[in-house]
């Protein structure tokens, strides 16, 4: 935990090291400053964790968390996220894959585990055809899911590599494009019945 990430996500919960609280809050403030947003001066790590990671647990050491790690989320300076992702791909063992999961966020996950593998598992459990899945995405961590789904839709503000992985590109998150798309789809389905 001291050398890998600021958070550890397991099947049992999300764990935050107590001794890194000030560093984490400082990084969060830097992230929001880089995006032009302000945070209250009284923001604590507990406030942040409760909002972004409900159910998180503060721990004193790596020995205190339970369950097998499934991902290590990293907060990075937004302007350095892509560069850091490239560095991590080269520096980490092949069993770990860095996935850019947002502006200023990288998730370290087991290689071969992604949103598409989650959808595949769900399809197998429900005996569902992936061709019937409509998926939306805007980050590199969505690419495999967009390719796996019967129809993958990327947001216009997604990186080019994500837009290229999709079957269709619609407006941005700021334009509530997903809501509009789903409403239009439901209207078409209703009209066809």
Task: Map each language-model feature to its residues.
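Anion (oxyanion) recognition and catalysis
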Residues: 1-2, 163
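Conserved acidic, metal-coordinating active-site core of Asp-based
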Residues: 2-134
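Mg2+-dependent phosphoryl-transfer enzymes with acidic/Ser/Thr/Gly-rich catalytic loops
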Residues: 106-193
């Amino acid at each position: 935990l001291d050398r890998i990430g600021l958070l550890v996500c397991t099947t049992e919960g999300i764990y935050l090291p107590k001794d890194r609280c000030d560093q984490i809050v400082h990084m969060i403030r830097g992230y929001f400053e880089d995006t032009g947003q302000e945070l209250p001066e009284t923001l604590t790590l507990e406030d942040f964790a409760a909002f972004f990671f409900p159910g998180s647990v503060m721990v004193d050491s790596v020995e205190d968390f339970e369950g097998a790690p499934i991902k290590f989320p990293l907060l990075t300076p937004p302007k350095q996220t892509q560069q850091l992702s490239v560095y991590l791909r080269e520096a980490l063992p092949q069993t770990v894959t860095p996935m850019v999961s947002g502006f200023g966020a990288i998730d370290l996950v087991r290689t071969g585990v992604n949103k598409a593998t989650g959808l595949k598992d769900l399809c197998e459990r429900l005996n569902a055809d992936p061709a019937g899945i409509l998926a939306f995405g805007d980050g590199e961590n969505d690419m495999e899911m967009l390719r796996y789904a019967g129809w993958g839709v990327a947001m216009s503000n997604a990186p080019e590599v994500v837009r290229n992985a999709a079957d269709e590109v619609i407006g941005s998150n700021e334009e509530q494009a997903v809501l509009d798309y789903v409403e239009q789809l439901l209207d078409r389905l209703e009209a066809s019945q």
